[in-house]
């Protein structure tokens, strides 16, 4: 798959079209994985949120909310923030990775919104209270972990008789998968969710996922649940 990293060609010579501003977070990885899956040429710019780089004036012109990821598409001079909006934009731009049948499209949309409203914010709070602020707020830590486990249960039941979240592999899987990849941070016992493990490991084997996971910098192997 083509990938541009900080202006250096990674695999092929196609014209650079998209600037991606990102970091090694689940939301950032959604977009880098999508770009790899779609085969779009891009330049990845590291925005180190641990050093406050998301608050720099230059980045705020692209992402007024001071959040990664954000893109600039030089094909049409669009700039865009919010990972969900970017995924839908890239799907519409390429005609790929979202169902074309109206009924299936709206099934995909409901699960995409589920990710934005559920696993994204709730598991983000699990990360904060369990990994970065452990044992300092027991009520919050327990509350968000319980909600995270509930959301895992919702997804596991849904995947019981499905290979992917909505029929074929889609932007919905790309949106949800990076949040599950932090199961270790979340102290989730993956043995409780066998359908998620099957789905997760299948996606982890995709070359585009393996490439996109390492953007904007290598961070080691994708975590795989013990079996």
Regions found by a protein language model. Give the residues of each.
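GST-like domain detector, emphasizing the conserved glutathione-binding G-site
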Residues: 4-6, 12-142, 146, 156
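Short flexible/disordered coil segments
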Residues: 109-113, 182-186, 223-227
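Terminal-tail/helix-coil boundary detector
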Residues: 209-227
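Enrichment for repetitive, rod-forming helical segments
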Residues: 11, 36-37, 189, 213
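Short, solvent-exposed turn/loop segments enriched in Gly/Ser/Thr/Pro and often Arg
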Residues: 48, 171, 216-219
């Amino acid at each position: 798959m083509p990938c541009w990293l900080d202006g250096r060609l990674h695999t092929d010579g196609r014209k650079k079209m998209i600037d991606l501003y990102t970091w090694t977070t689940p939301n950032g990885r959604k977009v880098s994985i999508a770009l790899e899956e779609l085969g779009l040429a891009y330049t990845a710019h590291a925005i180190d949120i641990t050093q406050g780089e998301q608050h720099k004036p230059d980045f705020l012109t692209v992402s007024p909310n001071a959040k990664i990821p954000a893109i600039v598409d030089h094909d049409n001079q669009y700039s865009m923030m919010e990972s969900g909006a970017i995924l839908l934009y890239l799907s519409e731009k390429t005609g790929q990775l979202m169902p074309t049948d109206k009924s299936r499209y709206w099934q995909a949309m409901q699960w995409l919104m589920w990710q934005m409203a559920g696993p994204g914010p709730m598991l983000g709070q699990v990360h904060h209270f369990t990994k970065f602020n452990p044992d300092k707020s027991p009520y919050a830590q327990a509350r968000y972990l319980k909600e995270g486990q509930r959301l895992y249960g919702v997804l596991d039941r849904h995947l019981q008789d499905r290979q992917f979240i909505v029929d074929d592999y889609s932007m919905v899987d790309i949106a949800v998968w990076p949040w599950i990849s932090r199961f270790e941070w979340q102290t989730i016992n993956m043995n409780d969710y066998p359908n998620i493990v099957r789905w997760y490991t299948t996606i982890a084997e995709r070359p585009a996922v393996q490439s996109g996971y390492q953007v904007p910098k290598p961070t080691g192997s994708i975590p795989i649940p013990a079996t």
